[in-house]
């Protein structure tokens, strides 16, 4: 019987830094259900300059409330992709395997990350009779191809695809946070029905979510004194990275189409390579209706910020959601009880399924602006009904419910 679990996620961080809540919420609720859980994450806090280890130690143990962490020393990196980040990933996973004997042997490892070139932790688990679940939260290495960075026929990509496929085959189970995972395997013809090696009976779908108890508590207890949030304008909020994959420039240009409206304010929270160029664009084009706010918000303040919006934005490059999405902020948007506009077509769209906004490919900024305007000018009774549907939809993605789904997978091993 499985009782002791390692949750391995290089990017898992202590609660005060963590905006991607999946790992720490699973840890919390798995423990409530009787499991012993240890989280293994990097010493480096992603997208920050913070390194929790500064004395040459290979690892440190830390307790954050009921969360038991082991932070593995990893090298710093500045960019979201690049040699230093790849090396940091490799270093973390190989160092974890080297140090593994220092910790109590688990019955199960749930690994959310592994270095692209190989998977030493999976091999370690096989050698020591430990069950292994792969968690997949994005489409690496496919993103390299989807963003046009490299051809799928590139020899390196062929190797990386083979590594990923082998990982799915040799894991005891694979849990995707993206609903289109089954179609993904079918399209690649990796599933056994199409002659491939991947048994889809060992593949499961559990999306990301939101902890509604925390969200509602934090919304009431952690408020920000901010004139923009207190204003009577209808606030259209984007929260997230400001980089290539998020295509925030299209959102800014859509806001430009609405610059004559004095009743609307566009607020952008987040950081990334595109932030400064977009700030300059707004200054050059005198866009006073667009404001770039904090580069980073402590998670406990996010619920209040989103609760002050009139409309929230999901923004991506074309074709991003071809198998669905698992954006944590989408579920926070739902919990805030506000409509959502997304600028790309998403397969298995929760926005369309629950009728809580607009979601389709926006061919240009004018079409994007028209979509935003349609929510802003919606009759009040229709708007309030949409808000209520958003809150109701969030219940399907409450972390206690999602954890029960994970336990069902664990009990099948």
Where are these regions (language model features)?
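N-terminal subdomain of nucleotide-sugar transferases
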Residues: 1-61, 179, 256-258
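Acidic donor-binding loop of glycosyltransferase active sites
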Residues: 172, 304-323, 338
């Amino acid at each position: 019987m499985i009782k002791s679990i390692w949750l391995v996620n290089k990017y898992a961080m202590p609660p005060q830094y963590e905006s991607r809540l999946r790992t720490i919420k699973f840890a919390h609720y798995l423990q409530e259900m009787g499991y012993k859980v240890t989280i293994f994450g990097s010493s480096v806090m992603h997208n920050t300059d913070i390194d929790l280890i500064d004395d040459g130690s290979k690892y440190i143990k830390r307790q954050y409330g009921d969360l038991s962490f082991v932070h593995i020393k990893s090298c710093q990196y500045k960019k979201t992709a690049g040699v230093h980040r790849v090396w940091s990933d490799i270093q973390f996973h190989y160092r974890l395997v080297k140090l593994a004997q220092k910790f109590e042997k688990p019955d199960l490892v749930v690994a959310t990350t592994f270095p692209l070139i190989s998977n030493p932790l999976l091999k370690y688990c096989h050698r020591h009779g430990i069950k292994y679940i792969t968690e997949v939260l994005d489409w690496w290495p496919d993103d390299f191809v989807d963003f046009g960075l490299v051809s799928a026929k590139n020899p390196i990509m062929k190797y990386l695809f083979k590594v990923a496929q082998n990982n799915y085959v040799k894991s005891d189970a694979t849990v995707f946070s993206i609903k289109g995972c089954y179609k993904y395997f079918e399209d690649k013809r990796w599933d056994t029905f199409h002659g491939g090696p991947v048994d889809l009976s060992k593949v499961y779908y559990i999306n990301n979510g939101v902890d509604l108890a925390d969200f509602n508590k934090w919304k009431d207890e952690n408020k920000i004194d901010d004139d923009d949030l207190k204003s009577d304008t209808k606030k259209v909020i984007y929260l997230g990275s400001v980089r290539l994959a998020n295509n925030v420039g299209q959102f800014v240009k859509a806001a430009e189409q609405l610059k004559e409206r004095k009743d609307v304010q566009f607020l952008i929270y987040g950081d990334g390579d595109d932030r400064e160029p977009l700030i300059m664009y707004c200054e050059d084009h005198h866009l006073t209706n667009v404001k770039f706010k904090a580069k980073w918000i402590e998670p406990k303040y996010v619920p209040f910020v989103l609760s002050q919006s009139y409309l929230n934005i999901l923004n991506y490059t074309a074709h991003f959601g071809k198998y669905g999405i698992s954006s944590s902020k989408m579920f926070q948007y739902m919990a805030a009880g506000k409509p959502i506009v997304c600028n790309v077509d998403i397969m298995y769209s929760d926005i369309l399924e629950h009728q809580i906004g607009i979601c389709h490919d926006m061919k240009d900024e004018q079409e994007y602006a028209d979509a935003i305007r349609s929510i802003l000018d919606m009759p009040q009774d229709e708007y309030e009904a949409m808000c209520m549907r958003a809150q109701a939809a969030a219940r399907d993605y409450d972390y206690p419910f999602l954890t029960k789904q994970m336990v069902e997978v664990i009990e099948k091993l």
